[in-house]
Amino acid sequence: ASYRGGFADWLDLSWFRGADWGIAREALYNVTTGELLTGEDDSAVSACGVGVACLQSRQDSRSILYDLNGGEAVELGRFDRAVNTYTPGCVVLSGSDDPDSPYTLIDLDSGEKTAVQRYDTDYRSGNVAVLTTDNILKVYDGTTGALLTDVEAAPVEEAQYISVTALPDGYALLQYNDENYDTLAIQTYGGEGLLWSSAGEAEQYTYASYLTNTANGPLL
């Protein structure tokens, strides 16, 4: 076995297979309290936010979320699928009961499940943006979990592929591409809805990037 640090007061312990020295399982051990979090027999440990750990089975992706910010671990939920991202109050999982939806959004307070077609996490703020299968765009605050944006997106009918980019301050970008991955439209959304769209512009845009925020929304 070996260990590495990743969470305050917690060690990530690893057990190795003798044959090939591959990692067989991981667990978390609190050096102050002696608490041991083992998960499944083949669990892997990963971070899912500040002070939030996920123990996930390597075989069937069953996952357990723990909040490690206090003196003791607090279990946030157990899931039958892999955890992709977490923000206080909700989690995005791989897979869905809907065969046409690749992800599921779960409200941890109510247990409500929502089919999701795309999601993204902003590396600056930790904000999480999800686009549901019925084209509702939601942006959650990465620190508090507050719902910053909850608006209906305006899909482009000709689009075959959609991508979502989460931005600070509750903003998000949607990009629609055709079957050849050529950009058809880029849209910017905030809490008040659609702020800007390249559809109908004389110039064709293929890329947009967040620079800073203004009183009228993000400056791209």
What are these regions (language model features)?
Residues 1-7, 25-41, 61-78, 99-118, ...:
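Surface-exposed loop/turn elements that mediate protein-protein interactions on large endomembrane-trafficking
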Residues 1-15, 28-34, 55, 86, ...:
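Short intrinsically disordered, low-complexity coil segments enriched in acidic
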Residues 4-17, 41-51, 78-89, 116-127, ...:
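Repeated scaffold domains used in trafficking and secretory/extracellular systems
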Residues 12, 18, 23-27, 54-64, ...:
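Beta-strand C-termini and the immediately following turn/loop, strongest in propeller blades
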Residues 101-104, 157, 170, 220:
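Intrinsically disordered, low-complexity segments enriched in proline/serine/threonine
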Residues 157, 177-182, 189-220:
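Hydrophilic extracytoplasmic domains
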